[in-house]
Amino acid sequence: MEEKKVNIREMTMEDFEEVHALWMGIHGFGIRSIDDSKEGVERFIRRNPTTSMVACENDRIIGAILCGHDGRRGCLYHVCVHEDYRKQGIGQKMVEACLAALKREHVNKVNLIAFKKNDIGNHFWQGMGWTFREDVNYYEYV
């Protein structure tokens, strides 16, 4: 079996349509029309130009992570890999690339939100050694 060559690189706004299509193709993926609109993602990328990543095979985007920080703490959003490419280490490589980008900006602490019903995602984060926090409550103002 031929090994697929996957390239991890910084996400740019030129990637938006393909990344958005990837998000929309994943069952149960949580998208917000305001934050995840082209304008919302552009604002995010402009603020964090070097920290979000895509995984590409033959110029086709098969994975993506929005990653940013506020100068103190990083956050990962919309971590996803196309279903046909899972369990090949692609998600882990993208996360490692994001963490390296954050480290270059002197950000060492990173958070993320995984929905309770997202068994695949929760298993992934536990497998990567991330700590599940039971000592905090998460609040949101929309």
Predicted regions and their residues:
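A short beta-loop-alpha structural element at the N-terminal edge
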Residues: 5-19
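A short helix-loop-beta-strand connector motif used in the catalytic cores of GNAT acetyltransferases and
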Residues: 42-54, 75
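Conserved beta-strand in the GNAT
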Residues: 54, 60-68, 75-77
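A conserved beta-turn-beta hairpin within the catalytic core of GNAT-like acetyltransferases
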Residues: 68-77, 86, 132-135
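A short, internal acetyl-CoA/4′-phosphopantetheine-binding micro-motif in the GNAT/acyltransferase core
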Residues: 79-86, 114-115
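Conserved acetyl-CoA-binding loop-helix of GNAT-fold acetyltransferases
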Residues: 87-100, 127
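Conserved active-site alpha-helix within GNAT-family acetyltransferase domains
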Residues: 92-93, 116-135, 141
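Conserved GNAT acetyl-CoA-binding A-motif
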Residues: 102-114
